[in-house]
């Protein structure tokens, strides 16, 4: 017996949509949504395909997701070609199965079932889909959100289909995410011969006490919703490769994943004060990829928890851990934002897979969320 959720997931996996190439995935989704009365607006920017679709009017629940995937890696190490979906022992294998073509299929099938049962639903059901989430994310959801905000588009609730679950579908729901701030720092010295250090100024030696103090800072202790802010050095480079040359510069890149206890400006001020304390000559460049956001208990969180409890008989954990997602952009619209999706154990890995029963369950959960908020 065929299942529409699994069939649509397989059709999407067959399209090798390496970010930001959509490879025809959105055309497939748009066709299905238009068939049930959705108005679809293409919102492409540069090399990225996006669309905003809606049906009905009033209080708005949007489902958000991305059609792009990360590269599959060595295809020979997959049990089957990564873009040829295969089911083995109840598991659907293929790049994007869990992140996040399975969620997209579950959303669309849930919408089809919902509209069939509630053709005159009282609220507005919407979709925000992009092909640029896995790579730069410069021309995807962020640009769509900016365009929607510019025309005062209404968005009350948003369900992002990122793979939030750990062991069983719905055991973890993300009701927020930490902020992400990256510092690209260059410490300037004077290049010279290692035998004549008095004629040079070693930026590595200069920077060492600063870096030692930086990594020892306890930025905050977190709060009931967020873990403590984390700072990690990601890259550090200096030198010419020769053992007799004192380098002229040291480059270090470090990233903060920060809670709502801090702002990006507070972090910047503390780092700059530390640089001045150590009397370093430097240039610095900051990249804020997202502010922290939190959706407290309310109608959306309650609807999601209810759907999970109804179909999986478990109470989901509400967490804000993990990396960033497009939810950080959508939260700017003032919407309640929650992430609910499949188990994330194999995302971005060789042999990415998802339990087919989980996708069927996810579609039912999504439909129940629609019924609670916009029926």
Swiss-Prot record:
Q: Which InterPro entries match?
A: ArgE/DapE_CS, Bact_exopeptidase_dim_dom, DapE_proteobac, Peptidase_M20, Peptidase_M20_dimer, Peptidase_M20A
> Bound how, and how many: what does the cofactor note say?
Binds 2 Zn(2+) or Co(2+) ions per subunit.
UniProt: Zn(2+) 2 binding residues: 99, 134, 348
- Enumerate the residues binding Zn(2+) 1: 66, 99, 162
Can the keyword Protease be found in this entry's annotation?
no
Question: Which coenzymes or cofactors are required?
Answer: Zn(2+); Co(2+)
Q: Which Pfam families match?
A: M20_dimer (PF07687), Peptidase_M20 (PF01546)
Q: What UniProt keywords are attached to this protein's entry?
A: Amino-acid biosynthesis, Cobalt, Diaminopimelate biosynthesis, Hydrolase, Lysine biosynthesis, Metal-binding, Zinc
The molecular function terms of the Gene Ontology recorded here are:
acetylornithine deacetylase activity; cobalt ion binding; succinyl-diaminopimelate desuccinylase activity; zinc ion binding
Q: Which E.C. number(s) belong to this protein?
A: 3.5.1.18
- Which PROSITE patterns does this UniProt record tie to the protein? ARGE_DAPE_CPG2_1, ARGE_DAPE_CPG2_2
Top-rank taxon of the source lineage equals Bacteria
Q: Tell me the active site.
A: 68, 133 (proton acceptor)
What pathway does this protein act in?
Answer: Amino-acid biosynthesis; L-lysine biosynthesis via DAP pathway; LL-2,6-diaminopimelate from (S)-tetrahydrodipicolinate (succinylase route): step 3/3
Catalytic activity of the protein: N-succinyl-(2S,6S)-2,6-diaminopimelate + H2O = (2S,6S)-2,6-diaminopimelate + succinate
Q: GO:BP terms for this protein?
A: diaminopimelate biosynthetic process; L-arginine biosynthetic process; lysine biosynthetic process via diaminopimelate
Q: Function, please? A: Catalyzes the hydrolysis of N-succinyl-L,L-diaminopimelic acid (SDAP), forming succinate and LL-2,6-diaminopimelate (DAP), an intermediate involved in the bacterial biosynthesis of lysine and meso-diaminopimelic acid, an essential component of bacterial cell walls.
Q: How does it assemble?
A: Homodimer.
Tell me its family.
Answer: Belongs to the peptidase M20A family. DapE subfamily.
Q: Which NCBIfam families match?
A: dapE_proteo, PRK13009.1
The name this protein goes by in its record: Succinyl-diaminopimelate desuccinylase
Q: What's the name of its gene?
A: dapE
């Amino acid at each position: 017996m065929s299942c529409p959720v699994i069939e649509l997931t397989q059709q999407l996996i067959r399209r090798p949509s390496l970010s930001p190439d959509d490879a025809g995935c959105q055309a497939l989704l748009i066709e299905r949504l238009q068939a049930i009365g959705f108005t679809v607006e293409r919102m492409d920017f540069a090399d990225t395909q996006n669309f905003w679709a809606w049906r009905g009017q009033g209080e708005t629940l949007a489902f958000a997701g991305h059609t792009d995937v990360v590269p599959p890696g060595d295809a020979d190490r997959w049990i089957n070609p990564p873009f040829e979906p295969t089911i083995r022992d109840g598991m659907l294998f293929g790049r994007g199965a869990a992140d996040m073509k399975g969620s997209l299929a579950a959303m669309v099938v849930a919408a089809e079932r919902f509209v069939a049962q509630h053709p005159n639903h009282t609220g507005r059901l919407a979709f925000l889909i992009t092909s640029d989430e896995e790579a730069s994310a410069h021309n995807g959801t962020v640009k769509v959100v900016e365009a929607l905000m510019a025309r005062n588009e209404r968005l009350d609730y948003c369900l992002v289909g990122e793979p939030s679950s750990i062991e069983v579908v719905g055991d973890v729901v993300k009701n927020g995410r930490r902020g992400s701030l990256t510092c690209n720092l260059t410490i300037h010295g004077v290049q010279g011969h290692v035998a004549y250090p008095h004629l040079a100024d070693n930026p590595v030696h200069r920077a060492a006490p600063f870096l030692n103090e930086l990594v020892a800072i306890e930025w905050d202790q977190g709060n009931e919703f967020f873990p403590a802010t984390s700072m990690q050095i990601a890259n550090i480079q200096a030198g010419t490769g020769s053992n007799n040359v004192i380098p002229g510069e040291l480059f270090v890149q470090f990233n903060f994943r920060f809670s709502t206890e801090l702002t990006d400006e507070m972090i910047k001020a503390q780092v700059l004060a530390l640089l001045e304390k150590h009397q370093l000559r430097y240039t610095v460049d900051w990249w804020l990829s997202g502010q922290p956001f939190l959706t407290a208990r309310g109608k959306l969180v309650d609807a999601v928890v209810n759907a999970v409890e109804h179909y999986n008989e478990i109470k989901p954990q509400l967490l804000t851990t993990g990396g960033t997602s497009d939810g950080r952009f959508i939260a700017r619209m003032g919407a309640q934002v929650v992430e609910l999706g499949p188990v994330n154990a194999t995302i971005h890995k060789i042999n990415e897979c998802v339990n087919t029963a989980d996708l069927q369950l996810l579609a039912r959960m999504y439909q129940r969320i629609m019924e609670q908020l916009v029926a």
